[in-house]
Amino acid sequence: MKTLKIIVLAITVLLAGQAFAQNKGYNRIDVSYVKAWTGQSEENIIYDRNGVGFDYMHGISLSKKIPLFLEVGGRFILSYDKSEIDKLDETALFSSITNLNSRFLTLGIPINLCYNFRINNKLEIIPFFGLYARAHIFAKTEIRVHKYSYGNFHSQDIREYDLLKSIDKNEKYIKLFNAGWTIGANVRYKPFIFGVNFGTGFIKTRENYTMCEFAATLGYCF
């Protein structure tokens, strides 16, 4: 009980200190490592993108007494995905291995609601919840089919597709627009910031799966 009282008192003092802090707007530029995946496979494909993100965010103070901020900005993500379909059957007359090499470029508009816990005049911990809208600018894949006969290489077929265009039955391989949510936390020390976040989409990228996303971010505030 005594420990609980101490914790409650510490939180109260921290929040009270926040009320007297001067809350100003800010700008932030970030670079991020971004990993996207889906837990549901399709046609034995494991979707697993790795990429880099470039962000600009503007923080708007929502209150003079409470360090609550609304962040609005833009994000470019350049990513790639290498997937493999099927496995070689050395006993079969005909067998094949299909490799997919995909490249993506997306432009997103993230909106975050942040609360700045100011530890001292140099250090802040900033949890946030956000929403985003995103569009694919570029999405292409190269398909390499390696054909074998009794385990011996026979031939190779190479094709390239624009995933944003209709290929079969007027159905696109990937949707142009997407939207989702994210939750995370940043640690700011002086003008430098480091954070991690996780999120997933509201809209399925294709008809039967939704991408999840993790990002680790390093940024500079000014």
Predicted regions span which residues?
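Bacterial N-terminal signal peptides that target proteins for export
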Residues: 1-8
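Bacterial N-terminal signal peptides
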Residues: 8-16
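Short glycine/proline- and aromatic-enriched beta-strand/turn motifs that initiate or cap beta-hairpins
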Residues: 20-60
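Outer-membrane beta-barrel transmembrane domain signature
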Residues: 60-68, 78, 98-205, 220-222
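Outer-membrane beta-barrel "beta-signal"
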Residues: 210-222
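Flexible, solvent-exposed coil segments and beta strand-coil junctions
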Residues: 30-40, 86-95, 159-166, 196-201
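Membrane-spanning beta-strands of outer-membrane beta-barrel proteins
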Residues: 49-53, 104-108, 178, 211-213
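Outer-membrane beta-barrel translocator domains and adjoining extracellular loop/strand segments
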Residues: 39-45, 82-90, 139-148, 206-211
